[in-house]
A protein has these predicted regions:
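Active-site-proximal loop/helix segments of hydrolase catalytic cores
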Residues: 184-190, 194-223
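Short hydrophobic targeting helices and cationic amphipathic motifs
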Residues: 9-11
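Binuclear metal-ion centers of metallo-dependent hydrolases, dominated by the metallo-beta-lactamase
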Residues: 163, 207-286
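Binuclear metal-dependent hydrolase catalytic cores
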Residues: 4, 15-200, 266-286
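Catalytic metal-binding/acid-base residues of hydrolase active sites
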Residues: 80, 102, 204, 225, ...
């Protein structure tokens, strides 16, 4: 009997170990709306010899990996999405989440077509009502089949509400996201919290209701556009104060303009704060 109990105990331990999952976050792009360098070759103060200063437009990939199976979630479809996903080796997307509809977050949307063709089904896109009201008319052909363009739609829209849990399912298991509102000039953008990590790419301030979602984080990927203040984005000093005030353990700066050099930031920032760079990733066990 004892031998049988030991066998079952060992089996249970092995089963638990085999079901361990990780959440992997990849910074696909961390540049401002014009990227670094700008299209005219302007690097600003960024050293062109440092590859970590080459910044495509903002986007991240969130993956839950369980026993070599993945649930893959893309946040925003930047104009650089094709190259970003190719470099990251992405062959499947289970869902796309949108922070807002600005061109640097949505310009690559048409390249989602390949994932719809591979799966022979529409890709699920999640966005709030305000973003949908602007994004869907602009890219109507992606969401609605029609005689005018002659192509089937490739995307299915799903309207989400701020502060309500969103669960994305896929081969690697479920990922829980909480969208929260952020002030972004004259509009709201969405931040997303998952597994005590938050993504805040385009933000100048937060409504009071959102503060709980950015407090005591393990990781915060957060907007730090430039050195001087800006009407729609947080500048460096403001972001650093947020990180301190909200007791964030680790922070990664994103949406960085040409006046923020990677090496200079590394030398000046506290140890728990780093500038992002395209392709950087980190994982946590869950």
């Amino acid at each position: 009997m004892k031998k049988l109990q030991i066998i079952f105990l060992n089996y249970s331990i092995k089963l638990k170990l085999s079901m361990n999952s990780v959440i992997k976050t990849t910074i696909l792009g961390c540049g401002s709306s014009g990227g670094v360098p700008r299209i005219d070759g302007d690097w600003g103060v960024c050293d062109p010899n440092n590859v970590k200063n080459i910044r495509s437009r903002c986007s991240i990939l969130v993956e839950k990996i369980t026993n070599d199976k993945k649930t893959v979630v893309l946040i925003d479809t930047s104009p650089d999405m094709r190259q970003q996903l190719w470099k990251a080796g992405v062959t499947n997307i289970d869902a796309v989440l949108y922070t807002h509809d600005h061109a640097d977050q949505s310009g690559g949307i048409d390249d989602l077509r390949v994932f719809a063709l591979r799966k022979r089904e529409r890709v699920n896109v999640y966005l709030d009502k305000d973003t949908a009201s602007r994004l869907i008319p602009r890219f109507n052909y992606c969401f609605k089949s029609g005689e005018k363009h002659g192509y089937p739609s490739i995307l299915s829209e799903n309207i989400i509400d701020p502060y309500k849990e969103l669960i994305i399912s896929g081969p690697g298991g479920e990922i829980s996201f909480i969208p929260f509102l952020q002030h972004h000039g004259s509009i709201f953008s969405l931040g997303f919290k998952y597994n005590n990590i938050a993504y805040s790419s385009d933000v100048v301030d937060f409504p009071n209701k959102s503060l709980n979602y950015i407090s005591n984080l393990d990781y915060w990927i957060v907007d730090a556009l430039r050195v001087t203040p800006h009407p729609t984005h947080a500048h460096l000093d403001k972001t650093l104060q947020w990180i301190k005030d909200f007791n964030c353990k680790n922070a990664l700066l994103t949406n960085m303009h040409i006046d923020l050099d990677y090496e200079q930031l590394c030398n000046e920032l506290p140890n728990n704060i780093k500038p992002s760079y395209d392709g950087f990733s980190f994982s946590i066990d869950i």
